[in-house]
Amino acid sequence: GPMLARSLARKVLGNEEFCMQVDAHTDFANNWDQIALDEWKKTENEFGVLSNVPADKATKSDYTEGGEKLTEVPRQCAVRFLDNGFPDYIKPADGKVVDLTKPLLGHGWSASFSFAKCHLEESVPYDNFSIYAMPLEQFSRFARMWTRG
């Protein structure tokens, strides 16, 4: 599954400065690479990670140029606990922010979109022993990111 593949991906990293992780169904905007770099610089944090749950396909056009939600950013705020005790994020994102001038410190991390310096992959690697714990992936990695800088 994706968690095992993600845990192995860091083994093929060369000397890349930035790493990005996206879901397979992700669409990219024009100049996405420069936009991501510019937003990351606004974090003013060497260990900053840009991450968010992308808009679902039905509302994706609302967030593009000319869309009614162009200045909105979905924001993951709440964590719920599943019957098995695993923490999981409510989907779709349960909050939003409007007219940001720079990224906000988040309450979580999304495996659907993540952009950071590649040292993240070394200091907070995927736990390849949690390959069957899909809901646990995001929260456990977020907690380890938080405690490691």
Per-range role (PLM):
Residues 1-149:
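Catalytic cores of eukaryotic secretory-pathway lumenal/extracellular enzymes that build
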